[in-house]
Amino acid sequence: MYKESVQTYLQAIMMDRAETKAYYGLAVSYKYLKEYKKAISTLLKLVKIDDSNDSFFFEIGVCYLSDGHPEKAIEYLIKAILINRENLEAQIQLAIAHELVDEADLSLMIYNKLIETNPEFLKAYYNKAAMLMGMGNFLEASKTFFQLIKRNPDYYKAYLGIAMSFDKLAKYKDAIRYYKKFLELKQFSEDAVFARERVEELRNQYFSRENTLTLVD
């Protein structure tokens, strides 16, 4: 599909070098084909024609991220946000880019600001919590996941995050409880196998008959 669309958009550009829709469509096609360098090259030509559209700069940033160059992505994601401060996805991607260049403090600042100004934007909670887990800060990660499920009790990934955080904190009863909550919501997901196996491991290791601890369901 996208290979065919590349030819269509190239023909459109040949007929009109100022046709922004054709450049954008070509760039998006290249992106889905994972030809990120071609996508970036096309988008850079596009912003020379029209530098007022935040989506164009956003896509450049995303392509740089996908191509393994978060340091280059930052500049274009910032430009997208300056054009449109309501572009929440650009802010998320900017936070990811900062994390990837070892600027965790800036990444956390962006997530915190997003949560403060857009409390219903659940992706900010999840990404922040996942980042905190990656940093080994499991207590703060669990707190952030709890904020998320307070907003949306059906956000199943948050229950898995809480379970894994408690697991790392050696709060095994709580870990089992939240693994089970996750399984109630998503018993057939890819992570369900891990969750079931981990519950069984924890029960056998810490809550067996030989152990003085008991598990309360």
Task: Please place each PLM-identified region on the residue numbering.
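Short solvent-exposed coil/turn linkers within tandem alpha-helical repeat scaffolds
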Residues: 16, 118-121, 155, 185-192
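Terminal, low-structured helical/coil segments at or just beyond the last alpha-helical repeat
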Residues: 168, 176-217
